[in-house]
Structures are given as C-alpha cells and as structure tokens.
Amino acid sequence: MSKDDCIEFEGTVSETLPNTTFRIKLESGHEVTAHISGRMRKNYIRILTGDRVKIEMTAYDLTKGRIIYRMK
C-alpha cells in the first residue's frame, strides 16, 4: 500500500495512553487509537489531551491510525 492510499481525518485527542499512543475522537463521532509519526517524534512535537490533530489511516484497519499533524 503506497502513501497515497491513506485516508486522512481530523479529530481531538480525548485520552493519552502509554507508549505515545492516543485515543482520538473523530469529527464523525468515532474513536480510534493513534500513535505519533516518526517525523513528529524526531522534532519533539508534544501532543496533549484536547489538541486538534490530523491523522491518517489505511482502508484495511479503521480503528488504528498515525498522527501526522497537530493543529495550532
């Protein structure tokens, strides 16, 4: 699966879980778990509960995702 095949969503961080994993509440009302992308980890971008984030998910598993951007 190439990078272009990912689906992007926006949501709000509702809970912080261990190992830099977060529970995200999407705008549609669904809740998914997501981890931080490597580029965000490398640049020490902190994510807190209540932050608006953009996540990408594959079509194969719509319960897990990767946080790719933190909104200002």
From Swiss-Prot:
InterPro entries: NA-bd_OB-fold, RNA-binding_domain_S1_IF1, S1_domain, TIF_IF1. Coiled coil: none annotated. Pfam families: eIF-1a. One of its GO terms (cellular component) is cytosol. It is found in: Cytoplasm. Gene3D superfamilies: Nucleic acid-binding proteins. Its main location: cytoplasm. It comes from the Bacteria. One of its GO terms (molecular function) is translation initiation factor activity. Residues 1-72 form the S1-like domain. Keywords: Cytoplasm, Initiation factor, Protein biosynthesis, RNA-binding, rRNA-binding. PANTHER family: TRANSLATION INITIATION FACTOR IF-1, CHLOROPLASTIC (PTHR33370:SF1). Belongs to the IF-1 family. One of the essential components for the initiation of protein synthesis. Stabilizes the binding of IF-2 and IF-3 on the 30S subunit to which N-formylmethionyl-tRNA(fMet) subsequently binds. Helps modulate mRNA selection, yielding the 30S pre-initiation complex (PIC). Upon addition of the 50S ribosomal subunit IF-1, IF-2 and IF-3 are released leaving the mature 70S translation initiation complex. NCBIfam families: infA. Component of the 30S ribosomal translation pre-initiation complex which assembles on the 30S ribosome in the order IF-2 and IF-3, IF-1 and N-formylmethionyl-tRNA(fMet); mRNA recruitment can occur at any time during PIC assembly. This is Translation initiation factor IF-1. The lineage of its organism: Bacteria, Pseudomonadati, Pseudomonadota, Gammaproteobacteria, Lysobacterales. The gene is infA.
